[in-house]
Each structure stands twice: as structure tokens, then as C-alpha cells.
């Protein structure tokens, strides 16, 4: 079963959509972005989230202490670090989470912006629960809706669980599942219309992933 994460949740309407179609994860972006939410907003939205949907906090080069503070305030299930975080940074973050009551059991996801095969070797250095592969775009920490070579994700699976992000949409959701069978897929702009989450696209995206999984059985 391919897991699905809908990232960039910021409105009560978005929560209503995901409660209806039940992705496995949703993402709250705390980094600078047009989808950015405050800790107060995320906490309020999470209170309305259906049981069983896990929350991922997305951070870029944030102070470790601030991340732990937001984890405590919002009761996040996972932390996705999407910047230039070092191996030492990740180890420090894990240690601080484990020493804090609200942080125990919180997963750490390390995002890597993939340019070529040489970037995959970086994964061996990190102790992460999940690796999220995104497209490399100069000057941007997100993939900006760009697709990378999915074959690289197959190589990354040697180092752990892999989520594929970057340019996923209704047009290619099933293709990525059938071609490399990743642990999970992450979508944001691919299920939006006019900069806002689109109920039809969310439903269709999840349906396409489910159908692709069935065809691969």
C-alpha cells in the first residue's frame, strides 16, 4: 500500500476535504511559503482532523529548540526537515525530541532535493525514519512543482523508507506507483486550483493511488 501525504494544509476547508478522503498524512508548513501556517493555526486545524490521519510539520533550517516547541504545542506526529540540515543537526534534533515528553515517538523525515545520482549517497549519512525526495530547483527549498528522475528513488530505497515528492499530480500519480512502488507519495500544488486545495483533485489523486496499488497486486 502506497501512503499518501497531502502537504500545505492551511484552511478549515482543507481539513474537511482530507477528513472525507483520508490520506495517511497531512503537512503543515512552518517554513517561509505561501502555504505557511502559524503554530496556533496548525493546532486549531489539528483539533478538527479525523483520527488516524497523521500530521507532519515541515521546517527549513529552523532552530532545533523552535521545532521541539512547535511539536509540543501542536502535538505533531512527524517532523520533515527540508533545508540544509546537517547530520549533526538531525542527531541533535532526535536527542532533544526523545528527551521531551511530547517528542517521544515523533518521526524525523529528511528531505533531499535530488539533482543526480550523487545526491542519493547523502542518505547513508542520516539517521532518518523517512527520506522524502524532491526535485532540485536552484534557489528553492521546495520542488516548485518540478519532477525529478524517479529511478533515483529506487536507488534511495537501499537507505530506508522513501516518499516521492515534486510535481506529482493527477496526470502522473499512478505512473510513479507503477514504475517504482515507493513507500509513499507527497503532493501539494498538484491537488490545488488557483492556489487552494481542490476537493475533486484530492479525491481523484487518492483514488488513482489506490487503483494503481490494486493493479500492482
Each language-model region and where it sits:
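Conserved N-terminal beta1-alpha1 strand-loop-helix module at the mouth
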Residues: 1-98, 104-217
Amino acid at each position: 500500500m502506497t501512503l499518501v501525504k497531502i502537504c500545505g494544509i492551511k484552511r478549515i476547508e482543507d481539513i474537511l476535504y482530507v477528513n472525507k478522503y483520508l490520506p495517511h498524512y497531512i503537512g503543515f508548513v512552518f517554513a517561509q511559503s505561501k502555504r505557511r501556517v502559524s503554530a496556533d493555526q496548525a493546532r486549531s486545524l489539528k483539533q478538527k482532523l479525523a483520527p488516524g490521519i497523521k500530521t507532519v510539520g515541515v521546517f527549513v533550517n529552523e532552530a532545533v529548540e523552535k521545532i521541539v516547541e512547535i511539536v509540543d504545542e501542536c502535538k505533531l506526529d512527524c517532523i520533515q526537515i527540508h533545508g540544509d540540515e546537517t547530520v549533526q543537526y538531525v542527531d541533535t534534533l532526535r536527542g532533544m525530541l526523545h528527551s521531551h515528553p511530547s517528542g517521544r515517538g515523533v518521526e524525523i523525515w529528511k528531505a533531499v532535493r535530488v539533482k543526480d545520482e550523487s545526491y542519493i549517497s547523502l542518505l547513508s549519512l542520516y539517521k532518518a525514519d523517512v527520506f522524502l525526495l524532491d526535485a532540485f530547483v536552484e534557489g528553492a527549498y521546495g520542488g516548485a512543482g518540478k519532477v525529478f528522475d524517479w529511478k533515483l528513488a529506487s536507488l534511495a530505497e537501499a537507505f530506508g523508507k522513501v516518499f516521492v515528492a515534486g510535481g506529482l499530480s493527477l496526470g502522473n500519480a499512478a505512473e510513479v506507483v507503477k514504475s517504482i512502488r515507493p513507500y509513499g507519495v507527497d503532493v501539494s500544488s498538484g491537488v490545488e486550483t488557483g492556489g487552494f486545495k481542490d476537493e475533486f483533485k484530492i479525491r481523484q489523486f487518492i483514488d488513482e493511488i489506490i487503483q494503481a496499488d490494486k493493479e500492482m497486486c
